[in-house]
């Protein structure tokens, strides 16, 4: 699906949208605008159901965003991280309450890493192996029918140590013949797990690895937690002798986890750009129509300078974010550097854009009825997601051999 001329080569990638990326962005923008946009999301925050299942059906199944990264032979779109970033920009601009990041990006990246470890996965008639189990789950996820979440705290940064909060503990009669292990422990602050039907759980013990767990299985419990970002509610997951199926162990599990976290950080940066651009656009539109002293407030030089500075920072951040997505798409050796740079820079730009949006809207920007606070809360939560700006700057310094003084 990707038609970027620089993808997969040594050439510098094109940081502008390709035709297919533009088409995806336009289609998704039109769909979300027709569904009511941020105003409908604001109304939804007052209900007990924060995630919009019908919207996810339209975005994930009808537009194919659930299977963007999944191969066409498995029912997906066969697209790349460039298309995923284009979709994330739009979803961020609408603060859409759908599990695209958690399921279509993070969990999918982990499963793709596992499935790629077995060259026989695509063959018909092969026995059920851990890698084939991962490939089978990808096929079920491709049309949005199954939503999967990686059971790690939202704040987990790429390169973090393998999670040890869940352990393999004991067994029950018959487990050995079914390949089931029993998991115990708790994971706090997990994003996009509330609407998930399947969990990918990193667990320590014997064997140390990545396990598939059915959310409806005995011994699995989820508890929503009060989240700053009401459009992406976090939850705590607990496992009490919950049955899990091993799909990757040892270094393969660690590689899958790191691939997922790296993809999550890179695509989250794209979401932050969509959010920042929407905050800028809303603010510019407002200061053009809001009048004080018989003139639009946007004509005042102080506001002009602040908006000009914001436009420059958003434009710079977009270039950094799209370079990171292009590196993820091509498997560039520069990927870790690009993602660390993008997440560090885009986090601060998004928060600044949301703060300026609230402040330049004046009194109305501080009210519950205006959606500006949704953008500020999403920006602040995203700035922690998959590593803070400081964590990514520290990682970047290590990657380029530039230690702190």
Where are these regions (language model features)?
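Generic hydrophobic alpha-helical segments
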Residues: 137-138, 257, 283, 324
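Short helix/loop capping segments that flank catalytic or ligand/cofactor-binding pockets
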Residues: 191-192, 221-222, 246-248, 277
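Alpha-helical interface subdomain recognition
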Residues: 1-92, 118-130, 262-405
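Short coil/turn motifs at beta-sheet boundaries
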Residues: 194, 230-232
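Generic beta-structure capping elements
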Residues: 186, 216, 240-242, 379
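Single-stranded nucleic-acid-binding OB-fold domains
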Residues: 190, 224-229
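Glycine-rich flavin
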Residues: 36-197, 202-221
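A short, charged helix-loop
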Residues: 233-263
């Amino acid at each position: 699906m990707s038609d970027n001329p620089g993808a997969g080569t040594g050439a510098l990638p094109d940081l502008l949208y390709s035709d297919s990326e533009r088409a995806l962005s336009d289609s998704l923008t039109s769909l979300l605008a027709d569904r009511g946009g941020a105003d409908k999301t604001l109304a939804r925050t007052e209900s007990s159901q924060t995630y919009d299942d019908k919207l996810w059906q339209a975005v994930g199944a009808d537009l194919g965003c659930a299977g963007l990264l999944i191969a066409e032979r498995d029912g997906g779109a066969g697209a790349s991280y460039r298309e995923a970033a284009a979709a994330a920009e739009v979803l961020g601009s609408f603060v859409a309450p759908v599990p695209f990041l958690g399921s279509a990006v993070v969990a999918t990246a982990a499963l793709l890493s596992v499935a790629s470890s077995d060259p026989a996965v695509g063959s018909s008639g092969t026995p059920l192996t851990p890698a084939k189990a991962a490939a089978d789950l990808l096929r079920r996820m491709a049309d949005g029918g199954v939503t999967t979440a990686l059971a790690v705290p939202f704040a987990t940064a790429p390169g973090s140590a393998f999670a040890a909060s869940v352990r393999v503990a004991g067994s029950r009669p018959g487990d050995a013949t079914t390949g089931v292990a029993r998991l115990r422990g708790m994971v706090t602050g997990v994003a996009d797990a509330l609407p998930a039907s399947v969990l990918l759980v990193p667990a320590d013990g014997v064997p140390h690895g990545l396990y598939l767990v059915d959310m409806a299985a005995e011994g699995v419990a989820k508890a929503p937690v009060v989240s700053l970002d009401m459009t992406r509610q976090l939850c705590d997951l607990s496992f009490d002798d919950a049955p899990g199926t091993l799909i990757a162990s040892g270094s393969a599990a660690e590689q899958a986890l790191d691939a997922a976290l790296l993809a999550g950080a890179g695509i989250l940066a794209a979401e932050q750009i969509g959010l920042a651009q929407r905050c800028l656009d809303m603010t510019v539109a407002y200061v053009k129509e809001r009048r004080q002293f018989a003139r639009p407030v946007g004509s005042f030089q102080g506001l002009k300078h602040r908006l000009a500075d914001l436009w420059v920072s958003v434009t710079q951040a977009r270039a950094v974010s799209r370079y990171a997505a292009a590196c993820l798409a091509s498997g560039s050796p520069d990927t870790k550097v690009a993602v660390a740079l993008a997440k560090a820079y885009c986090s601060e730009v998004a928060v600044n854009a949301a703060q300026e949006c609230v402040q330049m809207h004046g009194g109305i920007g501080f009210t519950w009825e205006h959606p500006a606070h949704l953008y500020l809360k999403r920006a602040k939560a995203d700035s922690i997601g998959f590593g803070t700006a400081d964590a990514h700057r520290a990682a970047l310094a290590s990657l380029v051999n530039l230690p702190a003084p």
